[in-house]
């Protein structure tokens, strides 16, 4: 009787993580990643506007940050799990198959930050301030993305008998292969083993840190990248102990899982930044791009603008200015007088230019 109750209390895995609509594959992992990105952009933009920024800024920055983040996340995953793709029995082409899962958060944050920096430079806004605005939204997006791991039957912990243990099913694909690691497969109904749902632990931890960040931001009104640093430190603290519960294959550094090692280093760096950064919050005026420079017009030309030359007068207009007509004959005495006057004027002009050059 006790055994039956325990089994009924286990969390079942989804029967599959991929559905096909004709030739199109709908992958739960990709859908949750997309939902997380949308939530991060929408909520992040609202927080940015509430802090004094312009509406739509986060979307503009995301155009740079999201592609960079996806590439960085995949690169980190491949580098820290390289035997899967480049070791014995591995296929290097699989490293490009992002839809099969495998994004490292550290690579996503690092390279995504580079993309955000580029976007902020183009918009003329401070990157630390943007990071503070989107920090809770990014962490909530991470929690949503972890549900994709649930459908893929991945990122789980050691085997357990706790009532909230996760059932991992055997899955069969189209060619008849049977394994719990088949992302494209469908459950056979047979339970391979029961494990700690570490992806769920991380998702719940992320939600708790999101609530903490929102409270701290409202209570203390911190800025200059310090809230983002608090997000990084909080996430690292949770990721460190969750990694210790995982039993899946991972690269090791001095016998420690690489993600635990990275979490510890980044945690320390985040705390150092948190205490060293400027206190208080940015002035709302700093969150809006500066107005464009002055537009040239009359008066002195501004930088980057070329002064317009006065249009040259034709012979007929010049004659009218001198009080003569182009068709009126000019006497020899008058012509000589005009030439003499023009010569003197030319000499004065040359002398004047010499004086200007010597100033």
Swiss-Prot record:
Subcellular location: Cell membrane
PROSITE patterns attached to this UniProt entry: LGT
Free-text function comment from the UniProt entry: Catalyzes the transfer of the diacylglyceryl group from phosphatidylglycerol to the sulfhydryl group of the N-terminal cysteine of a prolipoprotein, the first step in the formation of mature lipoproteins.
InterPro entries xref list: Lgt
Bilayer disposition of the protein: Multi-pass membrane protein
Bias-annotated ranges (Basic and acidic residues): 306-323, 350-359
EC top class, as a word: transferase
Species whose genome carries this gene: Rhodococcus jostii (strain RHA1)
Regions that span the bilayer: 24-44, 58-78, 98-118, 124-144, 193-213, 222-243, 258-278
First-listed, main subcellular location of the protein, grouped into a coarse class: membrane
Pathway terms, separated by semicolons: Protein modification; lipoprotein biosynthesis (diacylglyceryl transfer)
The entry's keywords: Cell membrane, Membrane, Transferase, Transmembrane, Transmembrane helix
Residue ranges, compositional bias (Low complexity): 336-349
Region (Disordered): 284-359
Single biological process term from Gene Ontology: lipoprotein biosynthetic process
Sequence positions that bind a 1,2-diacyl-sn-glycero-3-phospho-(1'-sn-glycerol): 146
Entry protein name: Phosphatidylglycerol--prolipoprotein diacylglyceryl transferase
Entry similarity comment: Belongs to the Lgt family.
GO-annotated cellular components: plasma membrane
Keyword Transmembrane helix: yes
Alphabetized GO MF terms: phosphatidylglycerol-prolipoprotein diacylglyceryl transferase activity
Domain of life: Bacteria
E.C. numbers: 2.5.1.145
Pfam families: LGT
